[in-house]
Amino acid sequence: SSDVCSSDLVTYDYIKSCFLKTGHNCPTKYKMPTLKEALAVCKDRIVVNIDQGYQYYDLVMAITEELGVTEQILIKGKKSVDFVDAQAKKYKHAMMYMPIIDINKPSGQDLFRQYMDKKIIPLAYEVCWQQETSEVKKCMKDILAQGSKIWVNTLWASLCGGEEAGMYDDYAFEHGAEVYQKVLDLGTSIIQTDRPELLISYLKKIGRHN
């Protein structure tokens, strides 16, 4: 269930006693894993995005270093270039880092400008926008010219152009996977989705997925 109780009532031991449910609300035999347990399963297999995790950077690093999976971990954030650099230098190994650029907002525009001015090329940028503006188009163009990649999150409309743009997952589910072509036409090469089967089937259809 997605319902959350008071933290005073839901203890770690209580969470460990619960069983996960399917999308149809049927209980399974599986329980909630800790981050350490989940990463142990993922070791040497996949890249793991620790979503909303930058504020827990040191805690995450302690776990990943113990397991030897640090270089498999992707973490994203909105901190300044200098802050991120100083944080990474504290450790022998580094997680992959990706800036999140809210390009419709002054703070996001400022962060993007830092990367451009310092000529820093991250592995990719997650670009978020609520409405189409000249800043959005220029941002996408500059990223590709720099030689980096564009990551677009299609989970919600507010992350990829708003309702009118029609680029988000539920819109694609209701109107057809061709919706994702609009995302690809921006130069996007990484799409974060809650509809992987729908997206992958479309990518295979157009020859963009092996």
Task: Go through each PLM region and give its residues.
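Short, small-residue-biased leader/transition segments that mark boundaries at the very start
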Residues: 1-6
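Structured helix-beta-strand junction loops
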Residues: 10, 18, 44-45, 70, ...
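Extracytoplasmic/secreted proteins, especially bacterial periplasmic and envelope-associated proteins
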Residues: 10, 14, 33-37, 55, ...
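Long, acidic (Asp/Glu-rich), low-complexity accessory segments flanking structured domains
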Residues: 10-13, 18-30
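C-terminal active-site rim and adjoining tail of enzyme catalytic domains
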Residues: 25-28, 106-210
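Catalytic beta/alpha-barrel core
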Residues: 27-30, 47-55, 68-135, 148
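A structural motif corresponding to the C-terminal end of an alpha-helix
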Residues: 37-48, 182-189
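Surface-exposed amphipathic alpha-helices with a cationic face
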Residues: 39, 43, 61-68, 84-92, ...
